[in-house]
């Protein structure tokens, strides 16, 4: 069971950082949309250009899809001792936002402007988890275990970014779905017997973080157990929880039907 839990944690953290699965980036009103490569690099395209990192993630390129020619935009400094790695979090207007992850879940965001050809650090301890239009779901760090963490909503402005909302202190799995935000929030334990992840509430709100509404709540089978939320959509909440007999089981809750079913592991 410990090995199973460790695997879940690793996959979940990778999904959030790289923008796959639970955190598919939406950019419906922006010119660029994203895809994930087999080696978990996020590439962005507007139909005529493609913005991407090379396989070693130390060079930023823009490729003209008509001519097939690629232009080197920026070389990226990589500190191998801190396991530093880059990923393109978002492309909005002329700005390319890059997340620089290092250490035990720390991260900074850098921005390259394709018009002015300038590159700078936008904000330290600032990780873009997901994006929609001019709004960003962010965190100050990304735990490498299953611990919840503070999540914020920022707005892209002409001067950089501006914080417009805080979703909560003990949150996870925040994502944009059809222009709305969905996220998991873990309330404080009611007594010493309950674990930090014993009870979870699922919320939705507007894209700017306002008008929060609780849509689902769930408790683990044991007070010292866990509930780990993997993905949230308009209809489905996918999670793994500790059952009464101490097993870790994955479930899907369908909000439309109100039914919960066990997910079979292949």
Model region roles, listed by residue range:
Residues 1-6:
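Positively charged n-region of N-terminal signal peptides that target proteins for export
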Residues 9-19:
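Bacterial N-terminal signal peptides
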Residues 17-31:
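Sec-dependent signal peptide cleavage junction
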Residues 27-35, 56-77, 103-123, 145-167, ...:
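Surface-exposed loop/turn elements that mediate protein-protein interactions on large endomembrane-trafficking
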Residues 35-45, 80-91, 123-134, 168-178, ...:
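Repeated scaffold domains used in trafficking and secretory/extracellular systems
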Residues 45, 53-55, 90-91, 112-114, ...:
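Generic beta-strand structural signal
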Residues 52-53, 96-99, 136-139, 181-185, ...:
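Residue position within the beta-strands of beta-propeller blades
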Residues 141-148, 185-197:
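Short, conserved, GDST-rich strand-edge loop motifs in beta-rich repeat architectures
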């Amino acid at each position: 069971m410990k090995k199973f839990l460790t695997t879940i944690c690793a996959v979940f953290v990778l999904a959030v950082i790289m923008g796959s699965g639970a955190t598919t980036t939406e950019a419906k009103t922006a010119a660029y949309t994203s895809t994930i490569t087999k080696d978990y690099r996020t590439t962005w395209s507007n139909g005529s250009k493609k913005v991407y990192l090379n396989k070693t993630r130390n060079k930023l390129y823009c490729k003209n899809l008509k001519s097939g020619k690629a232009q080197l935009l920026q070389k990226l400094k990589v500190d191998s001792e801190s396991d530093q790695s880059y990923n393109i979090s978002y492309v909005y207007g002329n700005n390319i936002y890059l997340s620089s992850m290092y250490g035990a879940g720390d991260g900074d965001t850098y921005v390259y402007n394709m018009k002015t050809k300038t590159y700078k650090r936008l904000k330290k301890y600032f990780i873009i988890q997901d994006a929609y239009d001019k709004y960003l779901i962010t965190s100050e760090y990304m735990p490498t275990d299953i611990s919840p963490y503070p999540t914020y909503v920022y707005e892209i402005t002409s001067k950089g970014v501006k914080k417009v909302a805080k979703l909560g202190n003990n949150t996870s799995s925040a994502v944009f779905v059809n222009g709305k935000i969905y996220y998991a929030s873990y309330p404080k334990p009611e007594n010493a017997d309950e674990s930090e992840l014993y009870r979870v509430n699922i919320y939705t709100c507007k894209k700017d973080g306002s008008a929060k509404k609780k849509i689902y709540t769930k408790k683990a089978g044991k007070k010292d157990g866990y509930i780990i939320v993997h993905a949230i959509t308009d209809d489905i909440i996918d999670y793994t929880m500790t059952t009464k007999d101490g097993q870790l089981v994955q479930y899907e809750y369908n909000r439309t039907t109100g039914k919960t079913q066990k997910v079979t592991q292949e």
